[in-house]
């Protein structure tokens, strides 16, 4: 701490004090409080720091290997991510598979506008776990395969990043109601400079006209929340940036705005072959509407790349 110009307080010293005997210190490169494993009489107590960004890597890098050495078996999991089909619909579609589960087990989770299935096998090795999991995964894919976008737990923006990189396509984004959220998620992926050209937040009608070339007559006739406006936004950002794909969003995120239209969002995807706009109607508060719009836009991007056969990646590696 002194090398960083911080005083070492009594509290900091207390954080690094552990019993002298039967104690394994777990290093914490992300904080000042190490963890420890105390062993006695064939039992172990494991202590880790509370902040998740410190605890989670310590658990994965230090605790899991320790537990694996002490156990004759291990747990191996695969995570399936599903978009476009709700948790209850997914559960109904695979009910007989879930009812028949023993090893591996299936655990469904709902998150925002998507559903996650975690398949976990009790096994002696990772290879054995994969062999147990594969038939269950195949049975699930047979039921809801068209809605699966990842079988390795990758999030939607990570999948889109993999597809963009593999296809060699470049993207630019024009956002209104999502306010830069799509761009933010895409460029959170390392190496995004290879395929992300630019992002523009064009919230006002004036900025849509000035920055993207949206026509005044389009806004007058159809309003700023319309398929027509979304298409001109997507075309504008693609042409001005030189990208292969332009994505746009415009909508009513709420809670104020057009009565009865809160949650209405238009998303457009522009390529040199043409531009298509899609309407989605989302429920929930402002945050949920915006999150849903981002996921829908990324899903349309994912489908666009796959449909053009510009990439040889399939669901089994994503």
Regions found by a protein language model. Name each.
Residues 128-318:
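Short alpha-helical segments enriched in small residues
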Residues 19, 26, 39, 48-50, ...:
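Short beta-strand segments
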Residues 1-70, 222-224:
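Proline/glycine-rich low-complexity loops and linkers
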Residues 22-24, 43-46, 79, 104-107, ...:
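Structural motif
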Residues 2-6, 23, 41, 60, ...:
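Generic secondary-structure signature for well-ordered alpha-helical cores
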Residues 39-40, 47-113, 118-120, 128-133:
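Accessory alpha-helical/coil subdomains and C-terminal extensions
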Residues 40-42, 112, 123-124, 270-274:
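Short acidic-glycine loop/turn motifs at beta-strand connectors
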């Amino acid at each position: 701490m002194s090398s960083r110009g911080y005083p070492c307080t009594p509290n900091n010293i207390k954080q690094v004090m552990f019993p002298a005997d039967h104690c394994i210190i777990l290093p914490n490169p992300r904080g000042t409080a190490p963890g420890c494993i105390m062993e006695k009489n064939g039992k172990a107590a494991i202590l880790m720091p509370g902040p998740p960004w410190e605890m989670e890597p310590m658990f994965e890098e230090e605790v899991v290997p320790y537990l694996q050495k002490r156990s004759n078996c291990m747990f191996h999991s695969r995570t399936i991510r599903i978009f476009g089909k709700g948790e209850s619909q997914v559960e109904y579609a695979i009910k007989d598979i879930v009812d028949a589960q023993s090893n591996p087990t299936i655990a469904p989770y709902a998150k925002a506008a998507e559903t996650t299935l975690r398949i976990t096998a009790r096994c002696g090795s990772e290879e054995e776990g994969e062999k147990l999991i594969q038939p269950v995964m195949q049975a699930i894919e047979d039921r809801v395969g068209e809605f699966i976008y990842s079988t390795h737990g990758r999030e939607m923006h990570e999948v889109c990043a993999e597809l963009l990189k593999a296809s060699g396509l470049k993207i630019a984004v024009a956002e209104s109601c999502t306010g830069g959220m799509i761009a933010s998620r895409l460029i959170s992926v390392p190496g995004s400079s290879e395929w992300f050209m630019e992002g523009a937040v064009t919230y006002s009608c004036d900025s849509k006209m000035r920055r993207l070339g949206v026509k005044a007559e389009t806004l007058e006739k159809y309003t700023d929340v319309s398929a027509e406006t979304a298409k001109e936004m997507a075309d504008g950002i693609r042409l001005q940036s030189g990208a292969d794909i332009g994505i746009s969003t415009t909508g009513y995120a709420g809670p104020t705005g057009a009565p009865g239209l809160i949650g209405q969002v238009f998303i457009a995807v522009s390529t040199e072959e043409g531009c298509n706009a899609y309407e989605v109607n989302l429920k929930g508060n402002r945050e949920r509407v915006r999150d849903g719009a981002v996921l829908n836009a990324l899903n349309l991007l994912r489908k666009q790349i796959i449909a053009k056969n510009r990439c040889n990646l399939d669901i089994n590696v994503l």
